[in-house]
Amino acid sequence: MAIQHPDIQPAVNHSVQVAIAGAGPVGLMMANYLGQMGIDVLVVEKLDKLIDYPRAIGIDDEALRTMQSVGLVENVLPHTTPWHAMRFLTPKGRCFADIQPMTDEFGWPRRNAFIQPQVDAVMLEGLSRFPNVRCLFARELEAFSQQNDEVTLHLKTAEGQREIVKAQWLVACDGGASFVRRTLNVPFEGKTAPNQWIVVDIANDPLSTPHIYLCGDPVRPYVSAALPHAVRRFEFMVMPGETEEQLREPQNMRKLLSKVLPNPDNVELIRQRVYTHNARLAQRFRIDRVLLAGDAAHIMPVWQGQGYNSGMRDAFNLAWKLALVIQGKARDALLDTYQQERRDHAKAMIDLSVTAGNVLAPPKRWQGTLRDGVSWLLNYLPPVKRYFLEMRFKPMPQYYGGALVREGEAKHSPVGKMFIQPKVTLENGDVTLLDNAIGANFAVIGWGCNPLWGMSDEQIQQWRALGTRFIQVVPEVQIHTAQDNHDGVLRVGDTQGRLRSWFAQHNASLVVMRPDRFVAATAIPQTLGKTLNKLASVMTLTRPDADVSVEKVA
């Protein structure tokens, strides 16, 4: 699908609050989130249109929640296949690991297949909602420089015209070969896998079985994935001595496909492309007024489908912080928490992806034999088998420092973890997901209590200036009890009983939830005021009447 760039006037000598380099998924998500926050954004993209061939094929529950946060999830869902299981097969076809988590704690299925070009198109179309956001295609970023209070970008159009853009901040979403990262000499440390893989996408799926299968064939490992809209993806390891040109030849392509199809000649090829699996992590995510996100900050093998999703986590973590800084509601030190929170988890996902690749294609043949034997034993260890089945090995993001307040060293503290998203009942009787009731805001959520009770008037003013929603959760049968209403507080019913269970488990009655849906702090009514003061301090929030016009980057 070819998505042409919109007819927009060039931004010659134009000033914006945020310039985003790259109109890939991370750049588009950043632009959508900042756009809805009223930030003046310019996206510049080297290509003349969105990439129109499939790349990533897995989108998880956290990424769908991010789509929900910018009002696009309903447009994205038609291009997904929910509850998409991943099955690892031995060379003889026995399934030794069946990963099909059925949890929806964040409001959406944990594993989903998707068609990336169509989802990217949804995000690009989403930008048309915001007059403060523009996207310029066919613009090459030739150079940039930082000053105390701005970044100057030098662009070149396809016709050779030069343009200058001045921005308060530059977010580099320009991919694994990031020009911005290389120009700043930020080390991009890691490894490149010795073997390449050839990806073959086929229309009118000739196999049409559901889910994704990864076969640990020692002769040539391969992957078979069912995608939405009747697309089938096959991936085959490129063996030593083979080249992409050789594998593209009809007789060799026929030989590859004969491993997985009875009639390799009767297929409709979309494309064939060879990939190298890299595992690399930028040493720094922030360099003064430049921030790295997505593949510009980290790249990982595809085996857990987390490259795309990690980029979405970057965008969700960074966008609300950047908006607060630009709006003068927080000092720019808040942006330092972006690397503090995201870098360690990105590394954990890289390590998991590398491990999954080694399980599929062990470096040594004896390791594959050992894998098959151990996997057989798992059938006799149900708790261990469930651990894999429910995908509990996936490192869930948890932040131990940053824009949050942790009391003590409680091992099972919910602070720094994503808050659940169950369905809730509104006072008018509508049932909706929790985030829909909150919007793109902070929230102070209390079980049964008035969340304003423990706050001073000054605190209420400060947190309302951030757009904070104050939520009182009650058992659904109490939702229409008028005597419990409080001005400025939204009451919701605990439709599924999940919120009561969550608060009971964590021995807290109040949660401060950030716009990216992570728990910033927990409290009880008597400690909420003190906790909010600590949180305002670590987030470097300004007072509603504070003058931050002299803010400088350290």
Curated annotation (Swiss-Prot):
<protein>
    <recommendedName>
        <fullName>3-(3-hydroxy-phenyl)propionate/3-hydroxycinnamic acid hydroxylase</fullName>
        <ecNumber>1.14.13.127</ecNumber>
    </recommendedName>
</protein>
<dbReference type="InterPro" id="IPR050631">
    <property type="entry name" value="PheA/TfdB_FAD_monoxygenase"/>
</dbReference>
<keyword id="KW-0058">Aromatic hydrocarbons catabolism</keyword>
<keyword id="KW-0274">FAD</keyword>
<feature type="binding site">
    <location>
        <begin position="17"/>
        <end position="46"/>
    </location>
    <ligand>
        <name>FAD</name>
    </ligand>
</feature>
<dbReference type="InterPro" id="IPR036188">
    <property type="entry name" value="FAD/NAD-bd_sf"/>
</dbReference>
<feature type="binding site">
    <location>
        <begin position="285"/>
        <end position="295"/>
    </location>
    <ligand>
        <name>FAD</name>
    </ligand>
</feature>
<keyword id="KW-0560">Oxidoreductase</keyword>
<comment type="pathway">
    <text>Aromatic compound metabolism; 3-phenylpropanoate degradation.</text>
</comment>
<dbReference type="GO" id="GO:0019622">
    <property type="term" value="P:3-(3-hydroxy)phenylpropionate catabolic process"/>
</dbReference>
<dbReference type="GO" id="GO:0019380">
    <property type="term" value="P:3-phenylpropionate catabolic process"/>
</dbReference>
<comment type="function">
    <text>Catalyzes the insertion of one atom of molecular oxygen into position 2 of the phenyl ring of 3-(3-hydroxyphenyl)propionate (3-HPP) and hydroxycinnamic acid (3HCI).</text>
</comment>
<dbReference type="GO" id="GO:0008688">
    <property type="term" value="F:3-(3-hydroxyphenyl)propionate hydroxylase activity"/>
</dbReference>
<keyword id="KW-0520">NAD</keyword>
<dbReference type="GO" id="GO:0071949">
    <property type="term" value="F:FAD binding"/>
</dbReference>
<keyword id="KW-0285">Flavoprotein</keyword>
<dbReference type="InterPro" id="IPR023786">
    <property type="entry name" value="3-HPP/3HCI_hydroxylase"/>
</dbReference>
<dbReference type="InterPro" id="IPR002938">
    <property type="entry name" value="FAD-bd"/>
</dbReference>
<comment type="similarity">
    <text>Belongs to the PheA/TfdB FAD monooxygenase family.</text>
</comment>
<dbReference type="Pfam" id="PF01494">
    <property type="entry name" value="FAD_binding_3"/>
</dbReference>
